[in-house]
Amino acid sequence: MNAGREEIRALAHSLVKNTNGQVDDESFNHIGLTINGVTVELHSTPGFMANFVYNRRLQKWLKRNVDAQCGNMVELVHGDGTVAVPTPSFNCVYQLYHLYHHYFYEGVGLRQVVDYFFVVRKWNVDCEKLSSLQRELKLLGLWRFAGAM
């Protein structure tokens, strides 16, 4: 769903009303809910950075990529429907950003490192993709952090 903060808030309240759930917390970029014992986060933006310049670049990068990500549909097993999943190149950049965010704001756990490991491992990098990836990471201020990982 490509929606603004108010639309996300309305969706959250609608979901909890229809499922006897509850709204747990709200932060700058998400609203947390519990539905049938399952914790869910609805994001108005997938991420943000404290540095004004890099945050602006990140928001533009996310907007440029939203259609490709929302349109990348994958069939679930047993014919249970389809879901949108990130493209491999987007996922590689986003998971590194996510790891970066945890490093500076919430603490990094093995979970975030393993998530990034599997994304990078699955994404067979050829020279053309590597060049594009390097450009995006430099643009977003993540290139040196990538070197540390």
Regions found by a protein language model. Give the residues of each.
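Conserved NTP-donor binding/palm subdomain of two-metal-ion nucleotidyltransferases/polymerases, i.e.
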Residues: A3-M149
